[in-house]
Each structure stands twice: as structure tokens, then as C-alpha cells.
Amino acid sequence: LYVPDHLPKPGDPGHAGHVARLVVEAVELLGGRTLVLTTTLNAMRAIGEYLQTRLDPAANVEVLVQGQSPKRRLMERFREGAGDGRAGCVLVASASFWEGFDVPGDALQLVVIDKLPFPPPGDPLFEARSQRVTREGRSAFAYHALPEAAVALKQGAGRLIRSETDRGVLVVCDTRL
């Protein structure tokens, strides 16, 4: 687990750009084998665009971004990884890749999570549950938001280790951790 302490706060407008720069260095060293999980579509697009324009062509890494191809195709291509003349891959994705996406083996060595996955403000279901917890005299943050974020973080981190022999690095780009 690595939590960079030099990044701006997650709410800072430049946060996604800083995450993208951190990812470029790692992806070039690993030859891809990286999954970037974002908590918003805006961050996903910003990081994906940055990687597509800034990765060194000599690194031989294909940038896959959720929404630019069908999900099944992105998953298949990422699992193929490098080899037999294929480039390595970095996949930048949001919500639907946080769970149920398994990549056992060497095709995945690094998972980067842009920030703690708290439920989005204004979500009616989240708001209703938070109000219920508050009416019960408990803290909505401690008893609802934080546990939901912890479960989502565990799901995202779980993309990295799928078998006893898997290993890799989890980077959470949120100084609040």
C-alpha cells in the first residue's frame, strides 16, 4: 500500500492531473499492467486523456478508457496484457470496474485509486439512509458514509489480489487515508 503525501486534497481542481502524472511514471516502468479506478467520470476522462497524450510511445503501452470501447472488449484486452507483439495496457475506469473484474496473474501489478470512494453527495438513496441514521441519534458519517467507503475501497483494492500467487502495489491518492 502506498499513499502519496505530496498530492493536493481530493477536492482540489488539480487533483486528477496530479494523479495522472503519478500514473504515467508507474505505467512506463511496468509496461502497463495498471488499473486506475476513479470515483467520478470527470476524473476518469481527465486521467485517460492525459495518459493518451503523455505516455512515451517507446513504453509500448495501450491506454484503455472505460466508455471508449465496450466493457467486455476492454476487459478482454486488459487480461491479454503484453506479449506476442501486443503492447501492455493501462485501464482507466470508474464505477463498474470497482468490483467483478478479475485479472489474475501478471497482467495486473498496480491498482491506483484516485480518492476514497465516499458515496456521491446528493444521491437520494444515500441521503435517505443518512437521515435515518441521524434520526437514530448516530453520526451519518461514522455509521453510514465511512462504512460504505470502506467496503467500496476493499472492492477496488481486491482487483489486485485474486489468487494466492498474485502480488502488486495498491496506490490510494487520497491524503485523508
Which positions does each model-derived feature cover?
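ASCE RecA-like P-loop NTPase motor cores
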Residues: 1-177
